[in-house]
Regions:
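Nucleic-acid-interacting cores, centered on viral/eukaryotic replication and modification enzymes
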Residues: 1-439
């Protein structure tokens, strides 16, 4: 039904900028989406705009109404809203006035009430326990670091029948209490700026380190849009049949897992890292006996702590490059089921939530990781590796995002089929991009 609804809209020129589950967000000011019979959109407009001013969403709505009229349908007035600053849809509460998005307000309040009651009673049936944990995960969807507070709660009721009453362990209750304390901070700042500083971290047997470079803002925004996401398979070795999902346990990570990407042809991240120079940020020793996954996580945690200490008045989006596939998956998911990585992510979750810090860890092959040198006692590479940029690196650094860059991004992830395979082509001209001026 969703496909049929989208095709109907596209025949009239609407549903052009579609938000897809687990896919990068559209680049335009207008974001459209369809879930069964609901057609919703979000449009970024200047602060000075009023609900009556025309913008891209005005044109989209007119085309959508024309599409419905063509088949004799009329939207129900009680369920039709337009030009709203604040709205609840797609399972979220969008607060346009303060530019934040969070889980649905009513569900959030109910979840907090249930958790408080559970902490007072200290007993529950397995069915109620699992329902509360499911609600807690939903509330955390717009604040992935909050999931790091939850670990043993996911299996606390496994040994009990659905209607059987049991007493949760102190550790499980403590996890819920910690999670509850941070619920007011579980939202996303939609106006958060991207940091043009791009970091890279690495670890060896004896030390870990971080380096930094500066990239154009338009490139950082595009890399942020293409960042790893929870539930989206990442291709680390370049082959179509060698995919690692971010939900894979970090305990399978090893030095070999970190270097598997070196066997493949150069990725976009490798070419980009080799095309710019880098500066040192920090370096310190780690225990030789420590597992490589936690060694790789430590410099990321240190970086989070340092960024959280910076004074700023709004949220910040930061990119970090790492050759550790378990860490790429764990940081995209917000938590790790591994007993190794979980505690490290939990320690820095408050730093991210309280300071509106959003961090994305992108994969780079070990051979191109600029943070590898300082971990092995060598100088940081301050100049580009090649005197001439590759075609891909030049396109990225110049902001020419075309079929070449898109294909490179797609090759690093397991994405859904393109819209051209699923939907009919869009009829009519694009939405006018000069309706609302700059946004």
């Amino acid at each position: 039904m969703t496909i049929a609804h989208l095709n109907l809209l596209r025949r009239s020129g609407a549903a052009r900028e579609i938000v897809r589950y687990k896919a990068p967000m559209p680049t335009g000011a207008l974001k459209e989406g369809v879930i069964v019979d609901d057609y919703d959109m979000v449009c970024i407009v200047p602060r000075s705009f009023s609900p009556t001013d025309r913008a891209e969403d005005t044109e989209a709505m007119e085309r959508a109404l024309s599409a419905y009229a063509s088949v004799g349908l009329t939207p129900e007035p009680k369920k039709t809203f337009f030009g709203q600053d604040n709205a609840d849809f797609w399972g979220a509460t969008i607060q346009g006035e303060v530019s934040r998005v969070r889980a649905h307000r009513e569900v959030t309040v109910r979840t907090m009430t249930l958790v408080c009651a559970l902490l007072r009673q200290r007993k529950a049936t397995a069915r109620i326990w699992n329902a509360i944990v499911g609600l807690a995960v939903y509330v955390s969807l717009y604040a992935w670091p909050a999931l790091a507070f939850l670990d043993i709660v996911f299996h606390e009721a496994d040994a009990y029948a659905p209607g059987e009453v049991f007493v949760p362990s102190r550790k499980a209750l403590a996890e819920l209490a910690s999670w509850l304390a941070f619920v007011p901070f579980m939202s996303v700042d939609l106006r958060a700026k991207v940091d043009t500083r791009v970091f890279a971290t690495d670890a060896s047997s004896r030390s870990c380190a971080a380096v930094v470079t500066r990239l154009p803002e338009y490139l950082v925004r595009e890399l942020w849009r293409q960042r790893p996401r929870r539930g989206v398979g990442q291709r680390y070795a370049g082959a179509a049949d060698n995919l690692v999902d971010d939900a894979s346990s970090a305990c399978v990570g090893s030095e070999a897992a970190n270097t598997q990407g070196d066997e493949a042809a150069s990725t976009w991240s490798a070419e980009l890292c080799n095309a710019v120079g880098w500066e040192p940020v920090f370096k310190y020793s780690v225990q030789r006996s420590e597992h490589i996954d936690t060694k790789e996580a430590r410099p990321i945690c240190t970086l989070v702590r340092q960024l959280a200490c910076e004074v700023r008045s709004e949220g910040l989006r930061v990119l970090d490059l790492s050759d550790s596939s378990p860490n790429v998956g764990a940081w995209a998911k917000g938590r790790s089921s591994s007993g190794r990585l979980g505690p490290l992510l939990r320690r820095v979750a408050p730093d991210q939530l309280l300071t509106d810090l959003q961090i994305a860890v992108l994969y780079v092959p070990t051979s191109a990781n600029p943070a590898d040198n300082p971990t092995r006692g060598r100088r940081v590479r301050r100049a580009p590796v090649d005197t001439e940029r590759s075609a891909l690196a030049d396109a990225l650094l110049s902001g020419r995002f075309d079929s070449l860059t898109d294909a490179s991004f797609r090759s690093s992830t397991l994405q859904a089929p393109p819209l051209s395979v699923l939907l009919e082509p869009v009829a009519g001209p694009p939405y006018p991009d000069d309706i609302c001026g700059t946004s």
